[in-house]
Amino acid sequence: MHSNVYLPETFLEKIKTILPSALNMDDFIAYCQQPLRKSIRVNTLKISVDAFLTIAQEKGWTLHPVPWCETGFWIEADESKVPLGNTAEHMCGLFYIQEASSMMPVSALFLGENQFESVLDTAAAPGSKTTQIAALMNNQGILVANEYAASRVKVLHANIERCGVRNAALSNFDGRVFGGWLPESFDAVLLDAPCSGEGTVRKDEDAMKNWSQESVLEIAATQKDLIESAFQALKPGGVMVYSTCTLSEEENQQVCHHLKHTFGDAVAFESLSSLFDGAEKALTEDGFLHIFPQVYDSEGFFVARIRKLASVNSPDVNKKMGKFPFQKASKKESALIEKSLSDSLDISLPADSTIWLRDNDVWLFPNALEPMLGELRFSRMGIKLAEKHKNGYRWQHQIATTLASGDEKTVVDIDTDAAREWFMGRDIYPENSGKGEVFVRYQGAIIGLGKWVSNKIKNGLPRELVRDKNLF
């Protein structure tokens, strides 16, 4: 029990007025005081669900399916010695520790859809939904992952890197700019909006310490601006999902109704009744999901799916972009780089991407990103392949996480002790020596790229992925 969960009396009085008649306040308070069940999502960019279930069984983990996410599971695991986040499986990117209800917005976005060519995640950090979207896109097309807080972009990038995402472009803007800067550019938009966090008390007992009705209204005003901009950035015929981890109608239903009032018949609410068995328990008359903690034993949450039926006006903006620092590699340069990569690491580049150059750095951008390159300033795009030196190319870690399958000739298998050393950023000393750059593999998963130097493999793990204690 979270006996210290703070629930302001004015908040509880408000909940009484919006709680559906089938639910009661005693259950609401009781569930708010219970810790959340831990949940994870299998990262299918790295492993199939079936293969992961086999690993989980071997490790003695008990998994229960999350009904609204085919790759999501509640997990029971002994973390007394090693936290889940420090297991080899997590550090290899095989799964993401993600609250079950936060898997729902992405499932709602992809409901009945085959594939999206371009997706905007408007408020992306720390990356749980971004990596979920990338997996459903199967690394195809372009995924713009925006985060307003500069301090959180680094964490977002580290999670994208760990999970093997290669079709993302990261930006660092207020989400209100997208309607003007990239109007009608995306097939799908996720707006998981900043909110008052009324649904998060089960993981943070102090979440409501600064709650007030005034702050709810202030946040709702920002959310209305954000949803307008997100809708303007959506292509006609496209779909968006608006979600929050809060319960107040001012931040949920009323924000969606504001969008409908602003853009009229261009806005269509699409029912989420078929998202999963049992969805009707949280369904509103508009087809939204308004989820109280006791309904599915989860966080409080809200999800709405909205279709754009017609083009709408977008604000005029005066762009000052500056010179774009990358240039597309010539056919000759591309062929040289691709041959060198194939010769040294046995890697072929995907057909839907193009090599770009910046000084001596070699990058791989998704082709679907190109129309946006002159329209928005990105902080990071695609993956870094190499740094060019006098004697050739120094290949980069993201090749290992995003392009290597494990079937390459240049793979070295290591044991548990060596894997621990590797994740701590240290060089390793396999029994047999070799030469050149190699992929390092542990228990079937590629964990990095290193280079033989005498009898050791020099560690190429980026600093942001290094862990220094309490490993598997």
UniProtKB/Swiss-Prot annotation:
Q: Which domain of life is it from?
A: Bacteria
Q: Which GO biological process categories is it annotated with?
A: rRNA base methylation
Q: Which Gene3D superfamilies does this one have?
A: 3.10.450.720, Vaccinia Virus protein VP39
Which compartments does it reside in? Cytoplasm
SUPFAM superfamilies to which the protein is assigned, alphabetical: S-adenosyl-L-methionine-dependent methyltransferases (SSF53335)
- Looking at its record, which EC class is this enzyme? transferase
Query: So what does this thing catalyse?
Result: cytidine(1407) in 16S rRNA + S-adenosyl-L-methionine = 5-methylcytidine(1407) in 16S rRNA + S-adenosyl-L-homocysteine + H(+)
Q: Which residues cross the membrane?
A: none
The protein's UniProt keywords, in alphabetical order, are: Cytoplasm, Methyltransferase, RNA-binding, rRNA processing, S-adenosyl-L-methionine, Transferase
Q: Which InterPro entries match?
A: Methyltr_RsmF_N, MeTrfase_RsmB-F_NOP2_cat, MeTrfase_RsmB-F_NOP2_dom, Nol1_Nop2_Fmu_2, Nop2p, RCMT, rRNA_ssu_MeTfrase_F, RsmB/NOL1/NOP2-like_CS
In its UniProt record, a GO molecular function of this protein is:
rRNA (cytosine-C5-)-methyltransferase activity
Has UniProt tagged this entry with the keyword GTP-binding?
no
Binding residue positions for S-adenosyl-L-methionine: A123, A124, A125, P126, G127, S128, K129, E147, D174, D192
GO cellular component, alphabetical, reads: cytoplasm
Q: What is its main location?
A: cytoplasm
Enzyme Commission code: 2.1.1.178
Q: Where is the active site?
A: C245 (nucleophile)
> Which family would the database say this protein is a member of?
Belongs to the class I-like SAM-binding methyltransferase superfamily. RsmB/NOP family.
Q: Which PANTHER family match?
A: 28S RRNA (CYTOSINE(4447)-C(5))-METHYLTRANSFERASE-RELATED, NOP2 YEAST -RELATED NOL1/NOP2/FMU SUN DOMAIN-CONTAINING
Instruction: Name the job this protein performs.
Output: Specifically methylates the cytosine at position 1407 (m5C1407) of 16S rRNA.
Question: Could you tell me what this protein is called?
Answer: Ribosomal RNA small subunit methyltransferase F
Record organism:
Vibrio vulnificus (strain YJ016)
